[in-house]
A protein has these predicted regions:
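Internal helix-turn-beta structural module
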Residues: 301, 305-329, 335-400
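Glycine-rich phosphate-binding loop of actin/hexokinase-like ATP-binding domains
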Residues: 153-258
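N-terminal glycine/serine-rich phosphate-binding loop of ATP-dependent small-molecule kinases
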Residues: 1-98
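Short beta-strand-loop/turn "lid" adjacent to the catalytic site in phosphate-handling enzymes
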Residues: 73, 77-125, 146, 153-161
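A mobile "lid/hinge" subdomain adjacent to the ATP/sugar-phosphate binding pocket shared
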Residues: 259-303
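Glycine-rich beta-strand-to-loop/alpha-helix junction loops that act as flexible
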Residues: 9, 92-96, 211, 325, ...
């Protein structure tokens, strides 16, 4: 069954085409549409076994972008399917499912209405995610669609971990609480890591660290999300590329009063101007920070130490919450590729039973590999995340 997986952002569409069977999957093509709504847009199409294809032209909206993707998929030279009839379903990544969606679901009018109702608390992502669904209805009418939510995995978090100590009325009226994100990735790498280490996923204590430009840590207790570092929004928790992570709210309101900033300006500051970018005034990319760190830049040293240290703090917190830990898993763009980050986070965790294998860690990039010694009581691993495969699998299981 050929499944198209879409991740629609405000000005981009990431996609994969995967041929799914009961026990196997085969990637046929992947690519990205960028700069939607700007004077010059881009399509970069990468079919497996064929030469990549690029197209540069105005792409005014998501529907136009998806049409270009479908044209590329059926192109005689660059395509991977003969006709669009071969696309049996479309799976969508949706950032926020609120309390409505504890699992993936087939798209209905009610589902679309609930996604729309969450625009207020997910203004950066849900509108674009829904736009992808509506565009498919126009260009592939009648094709089953499935929504897979970043928040679903975290719907098992107990109230003691998801509630804020604010007046309860704000939860009752507005559902202000911790939701967590990156759930699709956390679930996949926890399951895959447990299998790699020979652990029983449903009878284990696993801490997953999804570290990229956005980053979060999750406690997975007996196969279910028990706590996670992101909160009501993805700005909470770790020090990230441009997001501040944990901060005293009074510090933010104080800055707002002093600078005469609106709520929208404060929100933009915390989301887009903070994190390692704000600390260094250099870059939001950890590769740039690493170079500046090696050159002795004091701000880069501070930013990297804060970034790594915050991850280590959450690992310790979640080990305490779960009464121990069996495995720590690293994933995400930085988690999969930064040997320095993994070593730094694990250094000092020997008291918890972590015996980190520095030799195994060297050069481990974009692979699935155990990074702890054979005798380590707590296993450590790096797992390459595959959110698209999870979306394709959920889509296949719902429509087959």
């Amino acid at each position: 069954m050929v499944i198209l997986v879409l991740n629609c952002g405000s000005s981009s569409i990431k996609y994969q085409v995967i041929d799914m069977e009961d026990a196997s999957s085969k990637l046929l093509a992947k690519g990205i549409v960028e700069r939607i709504g700007l004077p010059e847009g881009d399509l970069i199409h990468k079919p497996v076994g064929k030469q990549p294809f690029e197209l540069h032209r105005p792409i005014p909206d998501h529907t136009t972008g998806i049409k270009l993707v479908l044209d590329a998929l059926t192109d005689p030279e660059h395509g991977v399917i003969r006709s669009l009839d071969e696309v049996k379903a479309v799976g969508h990544r949706v950032a926020h499912g609120g309390e409505f969606f504890p699992e993936s679901c087939i798209v209905t009018e009610e589902v679309k209405s609930k996604i729309r109702s969450l625009f207020e608390i997910a203004p950066l992502h849900n509108p674009a995610n829904l736009e992808g669904v509506l565009s498919i209805e126009k260009v592939l009418p009648g094709t089953p669609q499935v929504t897979v939510f970043d928040t679903s995995f975290h719907q098992t978090i107990p109230a003691v971990n998801f509630m804020y100590a604010l007046p309860h009325a704000y939860y009752d009226k507005y559902r202000v609480r911790k939701y967590g994100f990156h759930g699709t990735s956390h679930k996949y790498v926890a399951q895959t890591g447990a299998k790699l280490a020979g652990l029983d996923f449903e009878n284990s204590k696993i801490i997953t660290c999804h570290i990229g430009n956005g980053a979060s840590v999750t406690a997975v207790l007996n196969g279910k999300s028990f706590d996670t570092s992101m909160g009501f929004s993805p700005v909470d928790g770790l020090v990230m590329g441009t997001r501040c992570g944990n901060v005293d709210p009074s510090a933010v309101t104080f800055i707002g009063e002093k600078e005469g900033m609106s709520y929208a300006e404060l929100n933009e500051m915390m989301n887009k101007k903070s994190g390692v970018l704000g600390l260094t005034d250099l870059s939001s990319d950890m590769r740039d920070i690493d170079l500046a760190y090696d050159e002795g830049n004091p701000r880069a040293i501070l930013a990297r130490d804060m970034h790594y240290g915050r991850i280590r703090k959450f690992v310790g917190e979640y080990a305490a919450e779960m009464g121990g830990v069996d495995m720590i898993v690293f994933t995400g763009g930085v988690g999969e590729n930064s040997c320095e980050m993994r070593e730094s986070v694990c250094t000092g965790l020997e008291f918890m039973g972590v015996e980190f294998d520095r030799e195994a860690n060297k050069g481990a990039r974009g692979v699935n590999k155990i990074l702890s010694t054979p005798g380590s009581r707590v296993k450590v691993a790096v797992i390459a995340t595959d959110e698209e495969l999870v979306i394709a699998t959920d889509t296949y299981n719902l429509v087959k």
